[in-house]
């Protein structure tokens, strides 16, 4: 049976960086990956462009419960260190509205430079290794696969991800091993995910995109707000604006106690209410047909979608509806459509300095398996790289 200093479970963004970090520290390393290839989720990041970092990065862009842990990690391996790490691997980058991308605009470039470094360091990768059991003894950790392969190691780095995009490798199957060592799992719910809505407007405007101001309403109170693109779908709402506020909605809809969740949309954020009302009043007085009242303000199809409202020829009523349209959220879409996981291993049980378990010596965590969620825009990959590098500094 082969023995290693450290076994990294999971060959995603955090696991690959953890393995490189650990190997550079002169340790014997093995990567265990259940899929037939590595980095599949990384290849899908940013629509294949891989927004791997953000120009503005600190703990304030992450969930409140994780901020202390994130702050500690970034103080040791933050934006400057992440960029230097990839530059030394040969990856060139550029910044677009604060989001950092490889100059190739290909996620495969990010994965490839990591693969080249892993090969240079002679780090073995066991693909198709689905972990079935982890047993701890005085001699170390015995890791067994579903095919009855076994390895023994002194340290384990759990980098197996959360539950989003299970077809790409992260399905939450390693949470059970975390629990077996006493760790508490914050219930995982999908995040950066489309929302299902029951509203005829969504069906009528299916496929339409529009720039809006969107807010999440949880139990009648505004929780979050963003500006961005809204996309109407056959099942409800999607687009960047919805994905950005979906964490609050998902927690309310999927965790007990389940709370009423709504989406409040301003379809004309470029006009204040008084100006919109005045514009509509002028058009009504000028004899505009109801179907044409929104021409030049909203896409043409909106006239048909809101025709009953427009027929009222009441500028105040129309303005209120367009500036404060409320959609009742029924449910989130499933894990196959979620970009991130909200939830995971409770960060209060993890050492801020080393990312080692406070409950089990020589057990480390990194990446999305932890209850750490950043905003969209490169923050989650930044966490993956930072936490992976630090977890790899095992003693």
What are these regions (language model features)?
Residues 36-38, 43-44, 52-53, 58-59, ...:
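An anion/pyrophosphate-binding glycine-rich loop and adjacent beta-alpha core
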Residues 127, 301-373:
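A glycine-rich dinucleotide-binding beta-alpha-beta segment and adjacent secondary-structure elements
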Residues 127-140:
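A conserved short coil-to-beta-strand element within the FAD-binding core of flavoproteins
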Residues 155-201:
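Glycine-rich loop(s) and the adjacent beta-strand/alpha-helix scaffold that form part
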Residues 23-47:
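Glycine-rich FAD pyrophosphate-binding loop
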Residues 7-9, 32, 131, 150-167, ...:
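Short hydrophobic core segments
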Residues 47-97:
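Glycine-rich active-site loop/strand segments that organize a redox cofactor
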Residues 4-31, 391-395:
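N-terminal Rossmann-like FAD-binding beta1-loop-alpha1 element of flavoenzymes
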């Amino acid at each position: 049976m082969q023995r290693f200093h450290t076994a990294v479970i999971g060959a995603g963004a955090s696991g690959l960086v953890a393995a490189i970090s650990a190997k550079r520290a002169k340790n014997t390393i093995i990567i265990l990956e259940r899929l037939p290839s590595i980095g599949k989720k990384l290849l899908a990041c940013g629509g294949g462009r891989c927004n791997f970092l953000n120009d503005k990065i600190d703990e304030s862009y992450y969930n409140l419960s994780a901020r202390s842990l994130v702050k500690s990690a970034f103080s040791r391996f933050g934006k400057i260190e992440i960029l230097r790490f990839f530059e030394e691997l040969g990856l060139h980058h550029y910044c677009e509205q604060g989001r950092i991308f490889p100059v190739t605009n290909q996620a495969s470039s990010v994965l490839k430079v990591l693969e080249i470094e892993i090969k240079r360091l002679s780090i073995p990768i066991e693909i198709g290794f689905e972990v079935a059991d982890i047993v701890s003894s005085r001699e170390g950790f015995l890791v067994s696969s579903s095919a009855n392969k076994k390895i023994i190691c002194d340290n384990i780095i759990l980098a197996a991800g959360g539950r989003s995009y299970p077809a790409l490798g992260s399905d939450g199957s390693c949470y059970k091993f975390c629990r077996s060592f006493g760790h508490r799992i914050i219930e995982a719910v999908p995040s950066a995910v489309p929302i299902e809505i029951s509203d005829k407007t969504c069906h009528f405007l299916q496929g339409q995109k529009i720039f809006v101001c969107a807010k999440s309403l949880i139990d009648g109170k505004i929780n979050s707000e963003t500006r961005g693109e809204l996309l109407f779908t056959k099942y409800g709402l999607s687009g960047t604006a919805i994905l950005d506020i979906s964490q609050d909605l998902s927690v309310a809809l999927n965790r007990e106690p389940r709370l009423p969740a709504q989406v409040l949309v301003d379809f004309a954020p470029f006009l204040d209410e008084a100006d919109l009302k005045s514009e509509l009043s002028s058009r009504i007085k000028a004899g505009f047909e109801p179907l044409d009242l929104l021409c030049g303000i909203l896409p043409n199809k909106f006239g048909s979608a809101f025709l009953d409202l427009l027929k009222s020829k009441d500028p105040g009523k129309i303005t209120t509806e367009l500036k404060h349209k409320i959609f009742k959220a029924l449910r989130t879409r499933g894990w196959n459509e979620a970009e991130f996981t909200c939830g995971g291993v409770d960060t209060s049980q993890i050492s801020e300095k080393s990312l080692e378990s406070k409950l089990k010596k020589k057990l480390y965590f990194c990446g999305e398996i932890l209850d750490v969620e950043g905003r969209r825009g490169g923050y989650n990959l930044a966490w993956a790289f930072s936490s992976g590098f630090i977890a790899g500094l095992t003693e």
